[in-house]
Swiss-Prot record:
GO molecular function: diaminopimelate epimerase activity
Pfam family, one: DAP_epimerase
Pathway: Amino-acid biosynthesis; L-lysine biosynthesis via DAP pathway; DL-2,6-diaminopimelate from LL-2,6-diaminopimelate: step 1/1
The entry's keywords: Amino-acid biosynthesis, Cytoplasm, Isomerase, Lysine biosynthesis
Catalytically driven reaction(s): (2S,6S)-2,6-diaminopimelate = meso-2,6-diaminopimelate
GO annotation terms (biological process): lysine biosynthetic process via diaminopimelate
GO CC, any one term: cytosol
Catalytic activity, EC: 5.1.1.7
Taxonomic lineage of the native organism: Bacteria, Pseudomonadati, Pseudomonadota, Gammaproteobacteria, Alteromonadales
Protein name, UniProt field: Diaminopimelate epimerase
Annotated site (Could be important to modulate the pK values of the two catalytic cysteine residues): H165, E214
Origin species: Shewanella sediminis (strain HAW-EB3)
Enzyme class: isomerase
Residues annotated to bind substrate: N12, Q45, N65, G75, N76, N163, N196, E214, R215, G224, T225
Site (Important for dimerization): Y274
Length: 280
């Protein structure tokens, strides 16, 4: 039997598995079955806690989307990861350092129950996002072919928070065609590894509303790295302050970023739902 915990960060839900004290392996097919909300456990991502590869770190953090594919980063998942390893007694530290497939992040458990994540320095160079562009811009232009073969032009900012994001400004977040445009852009050829697509409505310089179409998972109730990406793009374009409240369908995150070349900090909740076990 494999023990797991169901958790969520603002409704972005996860199956979290301890791979430190348990010997576990999940194939992409198994993850797809487990992620199914009718016939499985149901989740946006599976989070796997592994022993560290570096003696200076506490854990290794792996993330798998509902389609079975492994991805580089998940901000909401990182907060749940921190809460999980403390709740399960895998560490007694307030500050936890973990590696991912794309780098290292620091997690800090706050006294109010929230978790703050040092998401690292946002990557803006197109080739490292990765996004095919001749040079770095604050705003990019892209053309995409609609299902009816008509062409549509999009203006957006692009950034990697350990995973690729593009962020579009919208006037009305409720009216935004998140599913249609998200599906059109997420696998566009100019994003070699696909992209998460954010739709940002600016309320004022310290407050935005956001919906995100996640690569491999469609629209979710919240996307932590998407909130980070939106704050970065808005600040680079001169529209947002250093500290931004981000309202997502599942709740609110606070993003702090002092500007280009500086690390970004994300603060928000991480909730335990239930513990369970499955046969493997």
């Amino acid at each position: 039997m494999i023990h797991f915990t169901k958790m969520h960060g603002l409704g972005n839900d996860f199956m979290v598995v301890d791979g430190v004290t348990q010997n576990v392996f999940f194939s992409p097919e198994q993850i797809k079955r487990l992620a199914d909300r009718n016939f499985g456990i149901g989740f946006d991502q599976l989070l796997l806690v592994e022993p560290p590869y570096d003696p200076d770190l506490d854990f290794h953090y792996r993330i798998f989307n509902a389609d079975g594919g492994e991805v580089e980063q998940c901000g909401n998942g990182a907060r749940c990861f921190a809460r999980f390893v403390r709740n399960k007694g895998l560490t007694n530290k307030q500050k936890i350092r973990v590696s991912t497939s794309n780098g290292k992040i620091t997690l800090r458990l706050e006294r109010d129950g929230n978790v703050t994540v040092n998401m690292g320095i946002p990557v803006l160079e197109p080739g490292r996002i990765p996004f095919n562009a001749k040079k770095m811009e604050k705003t990019y232009l892209l053309q995409a072919t609609n299902p009816d073969s008509t062409m549509q032009t999009f203006l957006f900012g692009a950034v990697s928070m350990g995973n690729p994001h593009c962020v579009l400004d919208v006037e009305d977040i409720e009216a935004a065609d998140v599913e249609g445009i998200g599906a059109l852009l997420t696998r566009h050829e100019r994003f070699p590894k696909g992209v998460n697509v954010g739709f940002m409505q600016i309320i004022n310089s310290g407050h935005i509303k956001l919906r995100v179409y996640e690569r491999g998972a469609a629209e979710t109730l919240a996307c932590g790295t998407g909130a980070c990406a939106a704050a970065v793009v808005g600040q680079l374009q001169g529209k947002l302050d250093n500290c931004v409240r981000v309202d997502l369908p599942g709740g609110t995150l606070t993003i702090n970023w002092e500007g280009e070349g500086k690390p970004l900090w994300m603060t928000g909740p991480a909730e335990h739902v239930y513990d369970g076990q499955i046969q493997q």
